Amino acid sequence: MARVQFKQRESTDAIFVHCSATKPSQNVGVREIRQWHKEQGWLDVGYHFIIKRDGTVEAGRDEMAVGSHAKGYNHNSIGVCLVGGIDDKGKFDANFTPAQMQSLRSLLVTLLAKYEGAVLRAHHEVAPKACPSFDLKRWWEKNELVTSDRG
């Protein structure tokens, strides 16, 4: 299957962390999320990276392509999605695995070094959503994973 050619970002000013809003039992990856996004009418997966439950980091949309993950910010940001984020009843929950969080930290360190001056942001900072279901700043600074619907 030929990949869609997207406009390239001119700058990378932010790295957004998202969750897939899936239950812990749903071990999905880029293939499934791509399909969900296409079912919504998108041309491809909106995120640049997806981190599966086992900590595997999968490439989504080309890293330099404009993403589709944070309205109004896609032109100058990268989107990273953690699989999970809700419990079996559909409530927001920081149910991410230690392997996921280790992979997230490693990926973010790499991206922040690569894109000097980029800032780390949670999706809920720019949209009325609970995504990514945890307090990103607290986790980044103190390594404490705490469920949060607003950060």
From Swiss-Prot:
Presence of the UniProt keyword Cell division in the record: no
Site entry: Important for catalytic activity: 129
Compartmental location: Host cytoplasm
Keyword vocabulary terms for this entry: Antimicrobial, Bacteriolytic enzyme, Cytolysis, Host cell lysis by virus, Host cytoplasm, Hydrolase, Late protein, Metal-binding, Viral release from host cell, Zinc
One GO CC annotation: host cell cytoplasm
Cofactor(s) the protein needs: Zn(2+)
Residues covered by the N-acetylmuramoyl-L-alanine amidase domain: 10-132
Source taxon at top rank: Viruses
Entry binding sites for Zn(2+): 18, 123, 131
Site (Essential for amidase activity and zinc hydrate coordination): 47
The keyword Ribosomal protein belongs to this UniProt entry's keyword annotation: no
Summary of activators and inhibitors of this protein: Binding to the viral RNA polymerase inhibits amidase activity.
SUPFAM superfamilies assigned to the protein according to its UniProt record, in alphabetical order: N-acetylmuramoyl-L-alanine amidase-like (SSF55846)
Catalytic reaction list: Hydrolyzes the link between N-acetylmuramoyl residues and L-amino acid residues in certain cell-wall glycopeptides
Top-rank EC class of the record's enzyme: hydrolase
A GO biological-process term: viral release from host cell by cytolysis
InterPro entries linked to this entry: Amidase/PGRP_sf, Amidase_domain, Endolysin_T7_type, PGRP, PGRP_domain_met/bac
Cofactor binding description: Zn(2+) is required for amidase activity.
Entry similarity comment: Belongs to the N-acetylmuramoyl-L-alanine amidase 2 family.
PANTHER family: PEPTIDOGLYCAN RECOGNITION PROTEIN, PEPTIDOGLYCAN-RECOGNITION PROTEIN LC-RELATED
Function, in words: Plays an important role in the switch between viral transcription and genome replication. Once produced in sufficient amount, interacts with and inhibits the viral RNA polymerase that becomes unable to produce additional late transcripts. This lysozyme-polymerase complex in turn plays an active role in viral genome replication and packaging.
Quaternary structure note: Interacts with the viral RNA polymerase.
Protein name: Endolysin
Native species: Escherichia phage T7 (Bacteriophage T7)
